[in-house]
């Protein structure tokens, strides 16, 4: 059975689709790693809470069905970009034993230019579509929540991103450091928030190499 990697796309929870990121499967396939590229409904059709629940359902389905595709559910890694990185950080906070899954369902995770403090999102224009409630902001902000299990964790952001985007990742790293949670951070030289996607799909990039390493 092959190890498998799960990717969650970004788009501020309100845009894009897994098909925009299908090219990311190439380096994983070359390394004999199954690639699961998951989708979710978008705001304002659904709430952020709905999206979080959908990603939980996706993980449960993949865990229970990956063997049908030749996958090893004991070797699951996961990554996400932007809003997708937020969703991955949220999934790291779940007690998976509540769903009859191993508590440490992931063997490694990569957070690429994520959004971890939703209080900021609540104050900007995209919130017209997200319509985040105060309860959602409190429950779904991951900046102050430690992962429920310790795994290799890789955090990256683009060197040329706006300071606000960088600050999200740096603040999350600071929180992990204060709580003695080990991680590895690699800024991606020359990248902005959007070119990071192509870098993720480039098997010669540091980010892609690190994620492949997490996945084996």
Identify what each model region corresponds to.
Residues 1-216:
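Alpha/beta-hydrolase superfamily serine-hydrolase fold, recognizing
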């Amino acid at each position: 059975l092959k190890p498998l990697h799960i990717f969650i796309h970004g788009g501020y929870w309100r845009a894009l689709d897994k098909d925009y990121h299908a090219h990311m499967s190439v380096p994983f396939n070359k390394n004999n790693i199954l690639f699961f590229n998951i989708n979710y409904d978008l705001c304002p059709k659904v709430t952020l809470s709905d999206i979080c629940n959908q990603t939980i359902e996706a993980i449960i389905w993949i865990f229970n069905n990956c063997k049908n595709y030749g996958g090893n559910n004991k070797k699951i890694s996961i990554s996400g970009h932007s809003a997708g990185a937020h969703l991955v950080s949220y999934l790291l906070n779940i007690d998976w034993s509540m769903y009859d899954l191993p508590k440490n369902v992931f063997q490694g995770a990569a957070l690429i230019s994520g959004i971890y403090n939703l209080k900021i999102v609540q104050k900007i224009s995209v919130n017209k579509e997200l319509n985040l409630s105060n309860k959602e902001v409190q429950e779904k902000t991951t900046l102050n929540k430690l992962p429920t299990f310790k795994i290799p964790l890789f955090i990256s952001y683009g060197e040329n991103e706006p300071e606000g985007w960088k600050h999200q990742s740096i603040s999350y790293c600071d929180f992990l450091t204060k709580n003695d949670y080990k991680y590895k951070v690699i800024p991606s030289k020359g990248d902005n928030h959007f070119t990071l996607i192509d870098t993720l799909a480039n098997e010669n990039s540091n980010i892609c190499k690190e994620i492949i390493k997490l996945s084996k």
